């Protein structure tokens, strides 16, 4: 028995040792693996250094709350395919802590999920923490409750603001650390930003502003997270913060890093101009963007971020004052996440060209030559080697210029830069687009646009409301960001002897408002509405009225279009009606601001009851819409989801101003009655993400402020970019895709490097029709080409032969392809090839 016991004991001991050794080996292996995945991020005067390697960084801003989690994977994937290796995002304090101490990291607020998706795609992350972000986002990302902290002043050396900011900053960064998302932990976050464009307000706070910036710098630096930190538009950023540039042309406007050991970083290269209600269409050409990026990299830049790369949607009430629901739609990826060509493709080619220059840019010695008034040569080379890259710039906006460099002559197009990754071969020119173009189409849905059965519920105009103020309550403080709407009521008496009797003398109500909009009623009669604009928020509403002897009752509805998102002393910004008077009385002007008490309440009854949801619908009595309704009316109907899987929109034809919900989800604010100088609404289509929709019986609820609208004119549409074009000149540089870099030499991938035009349909679609083709001097843009005075007659025939029925086609751009009889009726014309095709799925489309 003792022997058997001893044997068992020995066996157990051996097993313990073996298991212990195995566990120890596994632990060491895991530790080694973890250590290997951790990346140290440092920097010097040339670039960021990630895991010991210098990097050129092409980054794009994508904001997680401005798209849905279902959209994130495709948006991030397309960003990577566009040549980006980094995604930049703000962190939105008022999204994550809408109420003090109550946090939200779910749905569109799931920051961790968003960052992990970026990591899954093998990309880096730049985290712009705030606390203030601007971003055309309501209140600049600061939560409303912060305004009500006693004694607080935002963004300065203020105890209360710093205490709340530190708590927020530590909460976010601790969360990132817990999820091991910093590069030093093996995560994708390589760079952080604290504060945002502070120099714009610093002067207002004097020494307190300087103290605050130093405090913010010390706060993030003290957390020792293993990543560098930047401050944008902050040339005096304290060490170790890296001062970075924001703007359109940082290659010319950025004074450079404030220390020799800091790299040149560009945190915002604006891809377009954000739009506000009342704006006409605006755009920034991709040629200008490409020129600015090439120039920045030619002048020691090693990081650029496109703001925005995908703008997305300001869902619900999240936009800043007057900002449209659609955000940065002209970015390389449009509001729906579709590739906007040629902006997407031309920048992708730029990134390819810069990558061919990577070694010279990061390790070469910079040199500059100025051969002419409008020309410049910047190049990087390593003496004694073949490593060399050059940027030949022509700043003449009217004419091409010839530049002689290293024994060769190069013709450079007007206001452009040619990139030579070996100082010999031109692989890219910023003004010569060889990538395809697209035109976006909104196709009326057959499935969703069945006859709508609208039902309506109209808000009741309040009578006398409780209140003791002789001055109308400030509207931001009244609504507390719970609603866009605040009611004001007052009563005033007019003696019959004070009513005008003289012919031509009339009485008027005048309301001076600080913004944003208002509606007014006198004695139950609707007087009308007024509004300011993004540039001029204050306005005066004046209307002729009929007063009665005795008591008169005035009702005003103050309307917000979002909170301000910029400027100093934001916590003291005011809006809403401020001065109200009655003009035309024989006794003189009656100032209701001083002589009457004002009652208040906030919001619509429908909002409080949640009648934009299925559950809330039952709480009020809906009536059938008979074709006409007053203002402040709710409209509801049901619709089936639009066909296909394409992005869906609602077009708000016939409507005025208000809010949209689908299945309880806030689509955003619309404002069709605020026309641009072109006589059109700034935004017509409003994005309904597919994740908001069910196959059938989707609830549409609209709150409309204005009377006599026509909801029957609204419709649903699906979005595509099935109109695909090319516009290539015969003297253009062939695509950079022909080139690669091997053993420090730029080499052609193919035997024949020739100029071609490429047309490619999205998904599984194929080219179904050639809608336009001309080799000559055609004019116009994709979606609207016309023939010029010169055209090869066989142009369409050639394109049809190359392209019909194919998902992708490549067309040689040369005279021999289009002038098969070798006759050229316009020899002195430099030929352009313009092609427009339609993609589809045949009869099933």
Swiss-Prot record:
Q: Tell me its EC number(s), please.
A: 3.2.1.23
Q: Where is the protein situated, by its record's location annotation?
A: Secreted, Extracellular space, Apoplast
Write down the Gene3D superfamilies for this protein, in alphabetical order. Answer: 2.60.120.740, Galactose-binding domain-like (2.60.120.260), Glycosidases (3.20.20.80)
Q: Which residues form a coiled coil?
A: none
Residue intervals of the SUEL-type lectin domain: 751-840
Q: Where is the signal peptide?
A: 1-26
Is Acyltransferase tagged as a keyword?
A: no
Q: Which GO terms describe its molecular function?
A: beta-galactosidase activity; carbohydrate binding
Tell me, which GO biological process terms does this entry list?
Answer: carbohydrate metabolic process
Taxonomic superkingdom: Eukaryota
- Family matches, as Pfam families: BetaGal_ABD2 (PF13364), BetaGal_gal-bd (PF21467), GHD (PF17834), Glyco_hydro_35 (PF01301), SUEL_Lectin (PF02140)
Give the sugar-modified residues. 104, 269, 300, 395, 752, 784, 814
Q: Where is the active site?
A: 197 (proton donor), 268 (nucleophile)
One GO cellular component, as annotated? apoplast
**Which CDD domains does its entry note?**
Gal_Rha_Lectin_BGal
Q: What family is it from?
A: Belongs to the glycosyl hydrolase 35 family.
Q: What is this protein called?
A: Beta-galactosidase 11
**What species is given as this protein's source?**
Arabidopsis thaliana
Taxonomy, top ranks, is: Eukaryota, Viridiplantae, Streptophyta, Embryophyta, Tracheophyta
């Amino acid at each position: 028995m003792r022997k058997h016991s001893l044997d068992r004991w020995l066996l157990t001991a051996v097993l313990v040792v073996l298991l212990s050794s195995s566990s120890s080996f596994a632990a060491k292996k895991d530790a080694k693996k973890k250590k290997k995945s951790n990346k140290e991020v440092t920097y010097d005067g040339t670039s960021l250094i990630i895991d010991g390697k210098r990097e050129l960084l092409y980054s794009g801003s994508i904001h997680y709350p401005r798209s849905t989690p279902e959209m994130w994977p495709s948006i991030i994937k397309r960003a990577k395919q566009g040549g980006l290796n980094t995604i930049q995002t703000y962190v939105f304090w008022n999204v994550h802590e809408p109420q003090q101490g109550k946090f939200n990291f779910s749905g569109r607020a799931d920051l961790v999920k968003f960052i992990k998706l970026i990591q899954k795609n093998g990309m880096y992350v730049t985290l712009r923490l705030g606390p203030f972000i601007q971003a055309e986002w309501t209140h600049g990302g600061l939560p409303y409750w912060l305004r009500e902290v006693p004694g607080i002043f935002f963004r300065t050396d203020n105890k209360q603001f710093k205490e709340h900011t530190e708590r927020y900053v530590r909460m976010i960064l601790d969360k990132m650390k817990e999820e091991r998302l910093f590069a030093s932990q093996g995560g994708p976050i390589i760079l952080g930003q604290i504060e945002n464009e502070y120099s714009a307000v610093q002067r207002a706070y004097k020494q307190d502003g300087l103290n605050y910036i130093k405090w913010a710098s010390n706060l993030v630096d003290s957390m020792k997270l293993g990543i560098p930190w930047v401050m944008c538009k902050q040339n005096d950023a304290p060490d170790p913060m890296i001062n970075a540039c924001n703007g359109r042309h940082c290659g010319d406007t950025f004074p450079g890093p404030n220390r020799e050991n800091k790299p040149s970083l560009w945190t915002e290269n604006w891809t377009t101009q954000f739009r506000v209600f009342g704006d006409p269409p605006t755009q920034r050409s991709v040629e200008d963007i490409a020129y600015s990026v090439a120039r920045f990299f030619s002048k020691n830049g090693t990081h650029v971020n496109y703001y925005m790369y995908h703008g997305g949607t300001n869902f619900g009430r999240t936009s800043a004052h007057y900002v449209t629901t659609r955000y940065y739609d002209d970015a390389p990826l449009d509001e729906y996440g579709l590739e906007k060509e040629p902006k997407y493709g031309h920048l992708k080619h730029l990134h390819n060209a810069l990558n061919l220059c990577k070694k010279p840019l990061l390790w070469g010695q910079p040199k500059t030559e100025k051969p002419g008034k409008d020309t410049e040569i910047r190049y990087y080379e390593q003496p004694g080697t073949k490593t060399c890259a050059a940027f030949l710039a022509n700043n003449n906006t009217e004419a091409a210029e010839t530049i002689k460099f290293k024994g060769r002559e190069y013709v450079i197009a007007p206001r452009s830069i040619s990139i030579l990754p070996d100082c010999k071969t031109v692989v890219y020119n910023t003004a010569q687009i060889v990538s395809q173009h697209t035109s976006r189409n909104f196709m009326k849905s057959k499935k969703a646009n069945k006859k709508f059965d609208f039902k309506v519920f109209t808000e009741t105009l309040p009578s006398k409301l409780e209140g003791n103020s002789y001055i109308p309550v400030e509207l931001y403080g009244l609504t507390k960001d719970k609603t866009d709407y605040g009611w004001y009521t007052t009563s005033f008496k007019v003696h019959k002897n004070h009513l005008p009797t003289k012919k031509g003398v009339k009485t008027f109500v005048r309301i001076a408002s600080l913004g944003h909009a208002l509606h007014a009623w006198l004695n139950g009669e609707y007087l009308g509405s007024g509004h300011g604009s993004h540039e001029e928020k204050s306005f005066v509403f004046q209307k002729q009225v009929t007063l009665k002897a005795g008591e008169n009752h005035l009702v005003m509805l103050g309307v917000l279009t979002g909170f301000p998102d910029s400027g100093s002393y934001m916590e003291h910004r005011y809006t809403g009606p401020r001065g109200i008077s009655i003009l035309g009385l024989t006794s003189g002007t009656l100032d209701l601001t001083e002589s009457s008490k004002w009652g208040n309440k906030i919001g619509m009854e429908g909002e409080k009851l949640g009648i934009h949801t299925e559950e809330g619908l039952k709480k009020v009595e809906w009536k059938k819409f008979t074709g006409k309704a007053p203002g402040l009316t709710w409209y509801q109907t049901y619709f089936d989801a639009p066909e296909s899987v394409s992005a869906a929109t609602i077009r708000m034809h016939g409507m005025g101003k208000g809010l949209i919900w689908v299945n309880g989800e806030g689509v955003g604010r619309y404002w069709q009655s605020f026309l641009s100088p072109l006589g059109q609404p700034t935004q017509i289509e409003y994005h309904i993400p597919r994740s908001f929709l069910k196959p059938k019986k989707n609830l549409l609820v609209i709150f409309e402020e204005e009377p006599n609208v026509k909801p029957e004119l609204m419709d649903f549409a699906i979005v595509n970019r099935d109109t695909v074009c090319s516009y290539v000149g015969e003297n253009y540089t062939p695509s950079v895709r022909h080139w690669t870099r091997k053993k420090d030499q730029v080499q052609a991938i193919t035997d024949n490097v020739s100029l071609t035009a490429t047309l490619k349909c999205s998904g599984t679609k194929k080219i179904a029709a050639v809608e336009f083709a001309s080799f000559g001097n055609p004019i116009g843009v994709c979606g609207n080409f016309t023939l010029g005075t010169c055209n090869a007659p066989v142009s369409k025939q050639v394109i049809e032969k190359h392209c019909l029925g194919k998902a992708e086609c490549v067309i040689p751009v040369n005279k021999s392809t289009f002038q098969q009889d070798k006759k050229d009726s316009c020899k002195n014309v430099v030929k352009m090839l313009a092609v427009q095709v339609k993609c589809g799925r045949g009869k099933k489309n």
